[in-house]
Amino acid sequence: MTGSHDKTARVWSTDHIQPLRILAGHLSDVDCCKFHPNGNYVATGSCDRSVRLWDILNGQCVRILTGHKGAIYVLAFSPDGKHLASAGADQRILIWDIGSAAQVCELKGHSDSVYQLVFSRDGSILASGGLDNCVKLWDTGGFDGDGKIAEPQKCLLCSFPTKSTPVHCLHFTRKNLLLGAGPFNA
């Protein structure tokens, strides 16, 4: 899966030179792509400030999610596939219900662009990081009956500042240990 400056995302196979699908519809660069856990869908984020959910089998856009005020740099699906988190230049994390296409939560706390999002294995924690040199952990296990997080302002569990290092990669291990990486300039 690749995103491109030509406003498309492309689905590739390792045994073909040509793309299997070209997903066109964004109005600007496609900066991030993420497969849904079931493998039948892919989400794309763009400088046009929208997230699109695509059906891989037929190449059709099935959802358009709008609400960001800047480019979208990162996407993360919850392990159960019911929610999608998106973030980017507007320093906010938006969480979406995939079934209804509704925004269920807005998480604020970063002071610069967010470049990394990852859910814990059980989906109860979302880790975020970016250019503000900080890793933040958010409680995402509190969805109410309407599928929304009751009190998003109380979701921030903790912040871990780095030593002047932007966070470019986060990963939860199988034992729920969080690994982070970024460039360090001494």
Which ranges hold each PLM region?
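WD40-repeat beta-propellers
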Residues: 9-12, 33, 51-54, 75, ...
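Terminal intrinsically disordered, low-complexity extensions flanking WD-repeat/beta-propeller proteins
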Residues: 121, 140-186
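Conserved strand-to-loop turn within each blade of WD40 beta-propeller repeats
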Residues: 2-6, 44-48, 79, 86-90, ...
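A conserved positional marker within WD40/Gbeta-like beta-propeller blades
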Residues: 7-10, 19, 27, 41, ...
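Loop/turn segments within WD40 beta-propeller blades
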Residues: 33-40, 76-81, 118-123, 163, ...
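WD40/WD-repeat beta-propeller blade N-cap
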Residues: 24-30, 66-72, 108-114, 153, ...
